[in-house]
């Protein structure tokens, strides 16, 4: 399979046809045409979400659905429909449920836990699942639920609070979007905001928005009103504040915390009637950076029957405590281990001795043929990311760097080049560890050891997505002796083979845990460079001589000026 073909499964704009998505506020009104494009032979691969070009993807989704099926094969109807020869599993009792959970290492706890589903068709008999929604799932290549979807969808459709943890790329987004769309279809009340999804980053919010649009396509509510989804952009926020757009126009809104709070405080958006509140990447939304904002959002949602859901690839103990305090009899769903990485990822540690050794290690990967693009390299700071970029660029590696200091247009162009295969390697910081969602990445390199096990899981989760395999390599030096201990724990919990010395490594002491938590385990690192020390000293002396010469000239000029 051409990996860059997989990577570039984004969409392009065809402005001449199809209903246009409103670019100003990212709101979506579903179309009503009846012809659909059949999935190709790679339909099992989840389509890539180009979050920097959401308007373009929306147009593509609409265009694809408007194309006729004149060239479709005669057997297309049989392929798109249910195969009578295929027996879909239906879970009818707790014994079958236990067997299913054991098969995917699911750990579900709580009071009166609903039975999981064995297939999407199972939802029709159990929950009167909307056939238009099921059709949208199948047309987008989602034919079978993933383990986390098997558990979370029936829990949510029973109107229960849920705390869910699953590996990166395990289908968590659909696990909360499918029941949300179904519950809004079932709600026969008047129009108004019913579903609210909170994401820590704009990129992730864009991604959720695109998926929600695909699911809600051609779904109509009361009086033939289309289900409306919106991404709370700066433009839409201004329209809500100025009353250009009614806050009752949308059924689902997706937003980052600060932007939502700004609109709510200006009384431009009423959250008191919201019935479904979802926190994606809950571990980030309830850490010290976002916890106050998340609390403000919870306070604004005053509906007595409010259903709350939290999803993430990692669930620290403090997030579990918060969940228990704000949720009503929640069902806790853990797929695999809550601190483990995706089992499709081969994890490896490489000792480099010092900072110079890391550059040598990358060059060895290139020479040995392990540097297989597409590749993402993570570093701990923007300064170090820039330095590594310059080093690899001079090695003639097809590389670019993306970080918070780059403009939106620059990030847009870099992502586009990476998707099309023009770029082989992308260097970035932790700021984008949760936002980038490419399905074809072969290798992730942690040039710097991550600051926590959660950061490590999210970093390496950029590969091994959609059921494909991937590889993650972490470089470490002598000064990382404490910082790598959480990484080794994640590797063990993920079922990776570890060296004998890793098994014999002493457990972390309380002092070491505190140092990692407070960021003290990561000491100041040397500059990334291959320039010899003698050359550095020579350059430094030259710079000092130039500075001294300029200083003398300025002093002479000032003396002449005052003497006059």
Swiss-Prot record:
It is found in: Nucleus, Nucleolus. A motif (DEAD box) lies at residues 280-283. Residues 1-45, 62-87, 512-564 are annotated as: Disordered. Residues 13-23, 33-45, 62-86, 553-564 have a biased composition (Basic and acidic residues). A motif (Q motif) lies at residues 122-150. Keywords: ATP-binding, Helicase, Hydrolase, Nucleotide-binding, Nucleus, Ribosome biogenesis, RNA-binding, rRNA processing. Its EC number is 3.6.4.13. Residues 344-506 form the Helicase C-terminal domain. Its main location: nucleus. ATP binds at residues 166-173. Residues 153-333 form the Helicase ATP-binding domain. GO terms for biological process: endonucleolytic cleavage in 5'-ETS of tricistronic rRNA transcript (SSU-rRNA, 5.8S rRNA, LSU-rRNA); endonucleolytic cleavage in ITS1 to separate SSU-rRNA from 5.8S rRNA and LSU-rRNA from tricistronic rRNA transcript (SSU-rRNA, 5.8S rRNA, LSU-rRNA); endonucleolytic cleavage to generate mature 5'-end of SSU-rRNA from (SSU-rRNA, 5.8S rRNA, LSU-rRNA); maturation of SSU-rRNA; snoRNA localization. It is an enzyme of class 3 (hydrolase). InterPro entries: DDX52/Rok1_DEADc (IPR044764), DEAD/DEAH_box_helicase_dom (IPR011545), DEAD_box_RNA_helicase (IPR050079), Helicase_ATP-bd (IPR014001), Helicase_C-like (IPR001650), P-loop_NTPase (IPR027417), RNA-helicase_DEAD-box_CS (IPR000629), RNA_helicase_DEAD_Q_motif (IPR014014). PANTHER family: ATP-DEPENDENT RNA HELICASE RHLE-RELATED, RNA HELICASE. Interacts with the U3 snoRNA and is associated with the 90S and 40S pre-ribosomes. This association requires the presence of RRP5. Also interacts with OSH3. ATP-dependent RNA helicase involved in 40S ribosomal subunit biogenesis. Required for the processing and cleavage of 35S pre-rRNA at sites A0, A1, and A2, leading to mature 18S rRNA. May also have a gene-specific regulatory function since it affects nuclear fusion by regulating KAR4 expression and contributes with KEM1 to ISP-1 sensitivity. This is ATP-dependent RNA helicase ROK1.
